């Protein structure tokens, strides 16, 4: 899932249905309502991933198309993106905790485009490991603006200082 930030706002099925009906009627939902809806969907999907044995992945903290003029001339995905600074460690932990409460937390990989989030992600990983699956919750590899020698070394150094580097999923190339 690629999100600007990871939301977490609890909602009942009735609340989510009301939000859906509101939007389908052409009304605009509030930020709080959007976060409730997104959270409900992410929890539902997480449970399905667990059932199917599929890893859930979160990519966050990227703002896309920030140069409006160039974005309108060249279109999306043409190089006008930037690192975001949304702080959402508490929301990520709450989302994983909600899935863990029902023993339906899937294998999960968490990527933030902001290297300042690495230590926070490292501590989140430790909150949800278990003895059934080594490295059940993983810190994704350094990516995009961090996919270079210094970025990878710094990310793996922080990961090794807070967790077990031997369970790291490894690096990737674009």
Could you describe each region identified by the protein language model?
Residues 136-138:
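Glycine-rich, often proline-containing surface loops adjacent to acidic residues and nearby aromatics
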Residues 1-107, 116-134, 151-170:
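Histidine/acidic residue-rich metal-binding segments in metalloenzymes
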Residues 174:
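Hydrophobic, well-ordered secondary-structure elements that form the walls
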Residues 140-142:
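Active-site-proximal segments of catalytic enzyme domains
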Residues 144-146:
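Conserved blade-ending motifs and adjacent loop-strand segments that build the rim/top face
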């Amino acid at each position: 899932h690629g999100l600007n930030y990871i939301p977490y706002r609890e909602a009942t099925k009735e609340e989510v249905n009301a939000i859906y009906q509101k939007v389908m009627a052409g009304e605009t939902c509030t930020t709080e309502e959007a976060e409730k809806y997104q959270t409900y969907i992410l929890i539902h999907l997480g449970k399905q991933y667990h059932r199917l044995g599929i890893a859930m992945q979160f990519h966050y903290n990227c703002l896309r198309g920030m140069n409006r003029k160039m974005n309108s001339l060249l279109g999306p995905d043409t190089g006008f993106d930037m690192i975001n600074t949304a702080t959402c460690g508490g929301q990520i932990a709450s989302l994983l905790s909600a899935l863990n409460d029902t023993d339906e937390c899937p294998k999960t990989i968490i990527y933030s485009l902001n290297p300042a989030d690495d230590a926070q992600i490292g501590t989140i990983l430790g909150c949800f490991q278990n003895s059934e699956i080594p490295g059940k919750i993983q810190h994704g590899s350094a990516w995009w603006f961090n996919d270079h020698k210094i970025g990878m070394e710094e990310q793996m150094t922080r990961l090794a200082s807070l967790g077990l580097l031997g369970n790291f999923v490894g690096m990737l190339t674009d």
